[in-house]
From Swiss-Prot:
GN (gene name): dnaK
Source organism superkingdom: Bacteria
Record's compositionally biased regions (Low complexity): 602-613
Induction: By stress conditions e.g. heat shock.
Listed name of the protein: Chaperone protein DnaK
Species in which this protein is naturally found: Pseudoalteromonas atlantica (strain T6c / ATCC BAA-1087)
Gene3D superfamilies reported in the protein's UniProt record: 1.20.1270.10, 3.30.420.40, Actin, Chain A, domain 4, Substrate Binding Domain Of DNAk, Chain A, domain 1
InterPro entries (alphabetical): ATPase_NBD (IPR043129), Chaperone_DnaK (IPR012725), Heat_shock_70_CS (IPR018181), HSP70_C_sf (IPR029048), HSP70_peptide-bd_sf (IPR029047), Hsp_70_fam (IPR013126)
Alphabetized GO MF terms: ATP binding; ATP-dependent protein folding chaperone; unfolded protein binding
Location of region: Disordered: 602-639
SUPFAM superfamilies in alphabetical order: Actin-like ATPase domain, Heat shock protein 70kD (HSP70), C-terminal subdomain, Heat shock protein 70kD (HSP70), peptide-binding domain
Keywords associated with the record: ATP-binding, Chaperone, Nucleotide-binding, Phosphoprotein, Stress response
Length: 639
């Protein structure tokens, strides 16, 4: 089996790691960074940019620069969280034909898994460049509180990126895996507080170690899949917009370019205030009116930032209490607190966590890398490279069906260890009912309408009988990825209907397959684009160098040779303008051949210059300068 890489597909940043011997190694990307911004941009010339290159051009291309797509993945357009984002995102969030939240960019409708696949492709390429081999399998992490639709959409993204997703693993569980593998002995209960760019999770995990065997058992999990650093940034941006409006009377929300500049500046200010008490947001020429350009200069203190976001930090405490209650533990039972996600670097977050648990969180876990490291370890477990590790994760929300009166009847309660399988027998609600509809739900509300609808299907061909007589066995089967498979069976006729729950909408297999093929086609297009750029760059360099050499050659080059070379230069310039790779390469070779005379002239001039500069007694002088010396060969073991 080939290598299974671990990918932390984050809202703000992503990270990739691989098992290197017994240790997981975080891999640096092409830009030399250990994390990659989860930003995708579509440039005017058709190039798809991912990561830092996409981030750099965001200000000038706000409509086609997509970020925080994880907040949309597996979500319906009508979801209140999506509606909230529509007002603050500079790009267009639209309603897809199936009711999902999609994005409009480069005059195309794009599904969130399709966009996230671009980030996963970058992670895949980063790993391949490091390993020197093709990578086809991965463990991808998701927030523990992701529902079934969001998990399925993440798997779809992996498939579109050309990866076989061997396992979907919860982010806090992955972080605990990274932390716990270094523990040599003893048992402990850890709380993983994961506040990332777009999501918040808390997981209570028991780590048992005995005779070298590690068991990681998730006791309870809770969270909010729409609370994270992006929301903190938005609070800062709103404050800056309002302050500028007070001073100038102008609303920057109507200017996408200005808002993109504000987003970058707001995020930077927030990060700076984790170590400084005050910073200044300075954006010259932020906008203009009839009187001329306007500049934004606003001082922001840590105290002000904390007042803007304190409500959101406090909002993370309720899930902490609920998770402890679900695990039947008290604060005193927690041995260690692990902080995960970049937003946990904020002093206010650390203060609240410390006060809640009555002890300092650990400082030896990298909040940006722990999740990817844990995913890589899980990859090692699945490939057989890591032995003696057992991971027992849970389903974050209850799963059930709608029964008579619009009630949700749970078959699998929240925090049940997965994989798991549960069956329950139901019956008909009316006399002579020939079919039943199985409506699958996820959530904690007793009222069916208050829960997330995961899908529905019909079981037909039930024999006519009085209500309550037929025996319909409904089975829920959750796999290790936390994805649900449902079946309904008529015990009388043995007729059965099965489905894998995708979402009430989601991408069909055909749509995913089409996106996989599009990605493959784009892979070839990207390769051709890269080759074209290389050919153009080589041609430009040759044109510049040749003209410079012709000038330096002067009269040593005949007019006839000069004319021949200039004609070849012009032909190459025309080929570059036309943009045909084969023509550029052909004309490049013709110019190299035409410039052969130039090389002869240059060599002759060098030889002449060398002869003039050599003194008559040079050889004697060289002999006089020779010094006999002992030497020792030094071998460099590092090479």
């Amino acid at each position: 089996m080939g290598r299974i890489i671990g990918i932390d597909l984050g809202t703000t940043n992503s990270c990739v790691a691989v098992l290197d011997g017994e240790k997981a190694k975080v891999i640096e990307n092409a830009e030399g960074d250990r994390t990659t911004p989860s930003i995708i941009a579509y440039s005017q010339d058709g190039e798809t940019l991912v990561g830092q290159p996409a981030k750099r051009q965001a200000i000038t291309n706000p409509k086609n620069t997509l970020f925080a797509i994880k907040r949309l993945i597996g979500r319906r357009f009508e979801d209140k969280e999506v509606q909230r984002d529509i007002d603050i995102m500079p790009f267009d969030i639209i309603k897809a034909d199936n009711g999902d939240a999609w994005v409009q960019a480069k005059d195309e409708k794009l599904a969130p898994p399709q966009i996230s696949a671009e980030v996963l492709k970058k992670m895949k390429k980063t790993a391949e460049d490091y390993l020197g081999e093709e990578v086809t399998a991965a463990v991808i992490t998701v927030p523990a509180y992701f529902n079934d639709s969001q998990r399925q959409a993440t798997k779809d993204a992996g498939r579109i990126a050309g990866l076989e997703v061997k396992r979907i693993i919860n982010e806090p569980t992955a972080a605990a895996l990274a932390y716990g593998m270094d523990k040599k002995k003893g048992d402990s209960v850890v709380a993983v507080y994961d506040l990332g760019g777009g999501t918040f999770d808390i997981s209570i995990i028991e780590i048992d170690e005995a005779d070298g065997e590690h068991t990681f058992e998730v006791l309870a999990t809770n969270g909010d899949t729409h609370l994270g650093g992006e929301d903190f940034d938005n609070q800062v941006i709103n404050y800056l917009v309002e302050e500028f409006k007070k001073d100038s009377g102008m609303d920057l929300r109507k200017d996408p370019l200005a808002m993109q500049r504000l987003k970058e500046a707001g995020e930077k200010a927030k990060i700076e205030l984790s170590s400084a008490q005050q910073t200044e947001v300075n954006l010259p020429y932020i906008t203009a009116d009839a009187s001329g350009p306007k500049h934004l200069t606003i001082k922001l203190t840590r105290a002000k930032l904390e007042s803007l976001v304190e409500k959101m930090v406090k909002a993370t405490l309720e899930p902490l209490k609920q998770a402890l209650a679900d695990a039947d533990l008290s604060v005193g039972d927690i041995n260690d607190i692990i902080l995960v996600g970049g937003q946990t670097r904020m002093p206010l977050v650390q203060k609240y966590v410390t006060e809640f648990f009555g002890k300092e969180p650990r400082k030896d876990v990298n909040p940006d890398e722990a999740v990817a490291v844990g995913a890589a370890i899980q990859g090692g477990v699945l490939s057989g490279d890591v032995k003696d590790v057992l991971l027992l994760d849970v389903t974050p929300l209850s799963l059930g069906i709608e029964t008579m009166g619009g009630v949700m009847t749970a078959l699998i309660e929240k925090n049940t260890t997965v994989p798991t399988k549960k069956s329950q027998t139901f019956s008909t609600a009316e006399d002579n009912q020939s079919a039943v509809t199985v409506h699958v739900l996820q959530g904690e509300r007793k009222q069916a309408a208050g829960n997330k609808s995961l899908g529905q299907f019909n079981l037909e061909g039930i024999r006519p009988a009085q209500r309550g007589a037929p025996q319909i066995e409904v089975t829920f089967d959750i796999d290790a990825d936390g994805i649900l498979h449902v079946s309904a069976k008529d015990k009388d006729t043995n007729k059965e209907q099965k489905i894998t729950i995708k979402a009430s909408s989601g991408l069909s297999d055909d749509e995913v397959e089409k996106m996989v093929q599009d990605a493959e086609a784009n892979k070839e297009a990207d390769k051709q684009f890269e080759e074209m750029v290389q050919a153009r760059n080589q041609a430009d360099g040759l044109i510049h160098g040749t003209r410079k050499q012709v000038e330096e050659a002067g009269d040593a080059l005949s007019d006839e040779d000069k004319a021949e070379i200039e004609a070849a230069v012009v032909a190459l310039e025309e080929a570059v303008k036309a943009g045909e790779k084969e023509a550029i390469e052909s004309k490049t070779q013709e110019l190299i051949q035409a410039s052969a005379k130039l090389m002869e002239v240059a060599q002759a001039q060098q030889a002449a210059a060398g002869a003039e500069g050599q003194p008559e007694d040079a050889s004697a002088k060289q002999d006089d300068d020779v010094v006999d010396a002992e030497f020792e060969e030094v071998k460099d073991d590092k090479k």
